[in-house]
């Protein structure tokens, strides 16, 4: 985990498989340096878990809000980034940082596909009567304010796992 990106005292913390927790104070003025620090940790000759970045076949990003655009995992391209940016007003503390991280990964690993999953995607099948319940229609019409549902990646995993345990399709 990279913490304090863009401020003094930035640090990366990770624990190699079977090893001790590693904590390094590294100057990370932007997400670019933070992603670079992660790459160096992954490929470190002594504590890394991969030999080189050719072993990384894709990069996954969890994005908080996909608005009404996304209902499943999506391969990142310029149009996807634009649509995530259009949802920034719905998750102003999260989406902009997600975009910065996605762009940093794409720049540092230009030949590696990037995929996004959205916390709101799981709830996209909610009927209009449920997602507009108790919300004035004008808020939805003017600003797409509605119930979106959150933590969908967790809900998806748990519901699939419970179905598996209970032998239910």
Language-model region placement:
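Short, low-complexity, polar/charged sequence segments that are solvent-exposed and flexible
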Residues: 19-22, 33, 78-81, 133-137
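Short glycine/proline- and acidic residue-enriched helix-loop micro-motifs
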Residues: 22-24, 83-88, 143-145
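Electropositive phosphate-/nucleotide-binding environments in soluble metabolic enzymes
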Residues: 28-32, 36, 74, 78, ...
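Short beta-strand-loop/turn "lid" adjacent to the catalytic site in phosphate-handling enzymes
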Residues: 42, 48-94, 122-132
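Phosphate-binding/catalytic loop of phosphoryl-transfer enzymes
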Residues: 95-169
């Amino acid at each position: 985990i990279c913490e304090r990106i863009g401020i003094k005292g930035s640090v990366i913390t990770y624990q190699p498989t079977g090893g001790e927790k590693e904590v390094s104070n590294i100057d990370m003025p932007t997400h670019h340096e933070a992603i670079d620090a992660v790459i160096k940790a992954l490929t470190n000759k002594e504590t890394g878990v991969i030999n080189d970045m050719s072993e990384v076949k894709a990069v996954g990003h969890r994005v908080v809000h996909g608005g009404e655009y996304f209902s499943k995992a999506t391969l990142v391209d310029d149009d996807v980034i634009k649509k995530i940016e259009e949802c920034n007003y719905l998750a102003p503390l999260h989406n902009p940082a997600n975009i910065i991280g996605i762009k940093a990964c794409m720049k540092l690993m230009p030949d590696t596909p990037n995929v996004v999953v959205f916390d709101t995607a799981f709830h996209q099948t909610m009927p209009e009567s449920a997602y507009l319940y108790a919300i004035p229609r004008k808020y939805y019409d003017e600003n797409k304010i509605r119930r979106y549902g959150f933590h969908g990646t967790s809900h998806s995993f748990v519901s699939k796992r419970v179905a598996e345990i209970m032998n239910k399709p």
